[in-house]
Each structure stands twice: as C-alpha cells, then as structure tokens.
Design a protein with these regions (language model features):
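HotDog/MaoC-like acyl-thioester-processing domains
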Residues: 2-30, 83, 87-89, 100-163
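Acidic, divalent-cation-chelating loop motifs in proteins
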Residues: 38-40
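Active-site helix/loop of acyl-thioester processing domains in fatty-acid/polyketide metabolism
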Residues: 49-69
Length: 163
C-alpha cells in the first residue's frame, strides 16, 4: 500500500504487516498520540477531542492529494461520532480516513479510530465537508483533476467512493 507523508502524523512507507487489518481499506492513516490534558472527569478521552483528531486526519488526507495548501476554503456541514470503547491515557490512535462519497462541491469523509493498546476500533465518525470559493460564500466544484487524484488514491486500497 502506498502512503503519502504531508505532516509528521501521517504514516508513510510502512509495510502492510504494520497496518491493522481493520484499516486496510483506508488510504491515509493519521497517527495521534493522546495527551493527558484531553481526558475528561472519568479519565476517558473527552468526546470533543475525537472531532479535533478527525479534523487533523482530514487535512492530512487533503494535503496528501495536493488539495489543501492553506488557501482551500471548506466548511463542516455535518458530523457524527460513534464511541465504541473508552480510550485512556497513555495511548496512541491510528485514524483511518477515506472518502465515502464525493459530490459536486462536497465530500463525505469516513473515519475509523484504531487503538494501538486495545488493538481494536474504538470509534467511527463521518463528516460532510463543503468546498467554497475563496470569498467563503459560493460553493466551488471539485475539478476533474482533483476528482481523478482522489479516486486514484482510494483505488490503491480497493475502495471506490460513491458519487
């Protein structure tokens, strides 16, 4: 599996044996260490932190495609997260991220949070992102070249996003 390195937290060039089977169909993986200050009163990873991690993974995905240079304007239209198992400090999560559906001006991102300590998926999430013109008002369609790069990346792990 080919991997892209755009930020320090994206895994790259690792052998398939290092990839948890649960994340084999995710073209990008974001490595996220848990920080002590992210715990809640019950010593679990606070629920809001999962959304921050998804944002970091999403930006890494777009950077890997050469689509996020800091000038791309996107807004979060919808998001959800299903918490399957508690996560506690110390821990490292691997976030698999992929495109579930690519619309004309939107992208539905899918995430799986894999615990290296528990060796299991501990949460899943989804986010609908809408791309805007630089003025932040008008929707901006994905170009043909961007769509082709995205589908080529997903195809490398045997995943085909819906359109």
């Amino acid at each position: 599996m080919e991997h892209f390195e755009q930020t320090a937290n994206l895994t790259s060039d690792r052998p398939d044996s290092d990839c948890p089977k649960e994340l084999a169909h995710y073209p990008i993986m974001h490595r996220q260490p848990i920080h002590w200050g992210e715990m809640d009163a019950f010593n679990h990873l606070n629920n809001v932190v999962y959304y921050r991690y998804a944002e970091s993974a999403r930006i890494g995905y777009l950077q890997a495609l050469g689509m996020f240079d800091g000038n791309m304007v996107t807004v979060l239209a919808q998001s959800s997260c299903q918490y399957l198992r508690p996560v506690t400090y110390p821990e490292t999560l691997l976030l698999g991220v992929r495109c579930q559906r690519l619309g004309t001006t939107s992208i539905v991102m899918e995430y799986s949070y894999y615990s290296t300590a528990q060796q299991a998926i501990v949460a899943t999430a989804e986010a609908v992102i809408v791309r805007l013109e630089s003025n932040g008002k008008d929707k901006l369609p994905w170009t043909k070249a961007e769509r082709e790069r995205l589908f080529a990346l997903e195809e490398k792990v045997g995943h085909v996003p819906k359109t």
